[in-house]
């Protein structure tokens, strides 16, 4: 069993115990109490799956938390602020663009648009988004540009469906790349997106071959066989 899985469960059990003590003093509001009940059911399920006793795990979690607090300074207790990262200029973000052969897909709370008329181009993906804990927090806008600067694709949050995860954004990027590569375009992803929003790397930390290169390699292998 992964030690991180065990220690995470232990800490969650102890933190639930602290929240329960807080609620016992009639200090919690309705949403707090509702989350407490839901998390209790979740912990029981995780305990059964892991084969761990909740009371024993709570004691172990207390030791972990106490050890962390002993090493913690008041400065470290501050909530980290979000950072806003920008690949695009204000002009690139606000520029209107048009599609000759429009294709649009909604994935969760994200809208993916691309121009299917674009072929045999080198395309770069750029994005503006906020980051917290070194992970994407909120996507503001992602756009696909040709080397000439024309906009040929876009991923944007839907105002009517707020809220998206880093995994949602990564999946949307995969859809956009797949659609653009279908017409033999070469798609590159900015370093900022690779680092925070699209951590699609193999075991050696290298970005994998894009789908069109994989298809070309497969055809080459088949012809050799």
UniProtKB/Swiss-Prot annotation:
Positions of region (Disordered): 204-225
Record carries keyword Membrane: no
Annotated InterPro entries: NS1, NS1A, NS1A_effect_dom-like_sf, uS15_NS1_RNA-bd_sf
Motif Nuclear export signal boundaries: 132-141
RNA-binding found in the keyword field: yes
SUPFAM superfamilies linked to this entry: Ns1 effector domain-like, S15/NS1 RNA-binding domain
PTM entry text: Upon interferon induction, ISGylated via host HERC5; this results in the impairment of NS1 interaction with RNA targets due to its inability to form homodimers and to interact with host EIF2AK2/PKR.
GO terms classed as biological process: symbiont-mediated suppression of host cytoplasmic pattern recognition receptor signaling pathway via inhibition of RIG-I activity; symbiont-mediated suppression of host gene expression; symbiont-mediated suppression of host mRNA processing; symbiont-mediated suppression of host PKR/eIFalpha signaling; symbiont-mediated suppression of host type I interferon-mediated signaling pathway
Places the protein is found: Host nucleus; Host cytoplasm
Motif (Nuclear localization signal): 34-38
Region annotated RNA-binding and homodimerization, chain positions: 1-73
Keywords from the named record: Eukaryotic host gene expression shutoff by virus, Host cytoplasm, Host gene expression shutoff by virus, Host mRNA suppression by virus, Host nucleus, Host-virus interaction, Inhibition of host innate immune response by virus, Inhibition of host interferon signaling pathway by virus, Inhibition of host PKR by virus, Inhibition of host pre-mRNA processing by virus, Inhibition of host RIG-I by virus, Inhibition of host RLR pathway by virus, Interferon antiviral system evasion, RNA-binding, Ubl conjugation, Viral immunoevasion
Domain of life: Viruses
Predominant place of localization: host cell
GO cellular component entries: host cell cytoplasm; host cell nucleus
Record-annotated disulphide pairs: none
Quaternary structure note: Homodimer. Interacts with host TRIM25 (via coiled coil); this interaction specifically inhibits TRIM25 multimerization and TRIM25-mediated RIGI CARD ubiquitination. Interacts with human EIF2AK2/PKR, CPSF4, IVNS1ABP and PABPN1.
Purpose: Inhibits post-transcriptional processing of cellular pre-mRNA, by binding and inhibiting two cellular proteins that are required for the 3'-end processing of cellular pre-mRNAs: the 30 kDa cleavage and polyadenylation specificity factor/CPSF4 and the poly(A)-binding protein 2/PABPN1. In turn, unprocessed 3' end pre-mRNAs accumulate in the host nucleus and are no longer exported to the cytoplasm. Cellular protein synthesis is thereby shut off very early after virus infection.
HAMAP family registered for this protein in UniProt: INFV_NS1
Domain notes from UniProt: The dsRNA-binding region is required for suppression of RNA silencing.
Similarity remark: Belongs to the influenza A viruses NS1 family.
Name of this protein: Non-structural protein 1
The organism of origin for this protein: Influenza A virus (strain A/Chicken/Shantou/4231/2003 H5N1 genotype V)
Gene: NS
